[in-house]
């Protein structure tokens, strides 16, 4: 858990006091004694694959190619290429089936 100093905004550290643990600021004299167990869990919402690829709008102006869909075997697919790793590695090609009823997505 990360708490911030209300006086200067810096991160507080946990240190051992005389009677209890406490949150203390290294920059200013702010100290907050811990009198009970402090727990707080936050689970971040994971991004959808579409969010990473620019959402539905990213597929509006892409070209199609003769790549068969592995799900419905439609003969064509839309594609776009993105650099997902290091610059010295090849780009990743993302495909979306041209069949509107299928819409399957995969990468190469």
UniProtKB/Swiss-Prot annotation:
GO terms for cellular component: RNA polymerase III complex. Keywords: Antiviral defense, DNA-directed RNA polymerase, Immunity, Innate immunity, Metal-binding, Nucleus, Transcription, Zinc, Zinc-finger. Zn(2+) 2 binds at residues 69, 72, 98, 102. GO terms for molecular function: DNA-directed RNA polymerase activity; nucleic acid binding; zinc ion binding. It comes from the Eukaryota. The keyword Transmembrane does not apply. Signal peptide: none annotated. GO terms for biological process: defense response to virus; innate immune response; termination of RNA polymerase III transcription. A motif (Hairpin) lies at residues 88-89. The keyword Metal-binding applies. Its main location: nucleus. Gene3D superfamilies: 2.20.25.10. PANTHER family: DNA-DIRECTED RNA POLYMERASE, DNA-DIRECTED RNA POLYMERASE III SUBUNIT RPC10. Belongs to the archaeal RpoM/eukaryotic RPA12/RPB9/RPC11 RNA polymerase family. Core component of RNA polymerase III (Pol III) which synthesizes small non-coding RNAs using the four ribonucleoside triphosphates as substrates. Can mediate Pol I proofreading of the nascent RNA transcript. Anchors into the Pol III active site to constantly monitor transcription fidelity, cleaves mis-incorporated 5'-ribonucleotides and restarts the transcription process. Once Pol III reaches the poly(dT) termination signal, can induce Pol III clamp opening and transcription termination. Component of the RNA polymerase III complex consisting of 17 subunits: a ten-subunit horseshoe-shaped catalytic core composed of POLR3A/RPC1, POLR3B/RPC2, POLR1C/RPAC1, POLR1D/RPAC2, POLR3K/RPC10, POLR2E/RPABC1, POLR2F/RPABC2, POLR2H/RPABC3, POLR2K/RPABC4 and POLR2L/RPABC5; a mobile stalk composed of two subunits POLR3H/RPC8 and CRCP/RPC9, protruding from the core and functioning primarily in transcription initiation; and additional subunits homologous to general transcription factors of the RNA polymerase II machinery, POLR3C/RPC3-POLR3F/RPC6-POLR3G/RPC7 heterotrimer required for transcription initiation and POLR3D/RPC4-POLR3E/RPC5 heterodimer involved in both transcription initiation and termination. The TFIIS-type zinc-binding beta-ribbon domain contains an acidic hairpin motif (residues Asp-88, Glu-89) that likely coordinates the nucleophilic water and magnesium to cleave the scissile phosphodiester bond and release the mis-incorporated 5'-ribonucleotides. This is DNA-directed RNA polymerase III subunit RPC10. It comes from Bos taurus (Bovine). The gene is POLR3K.
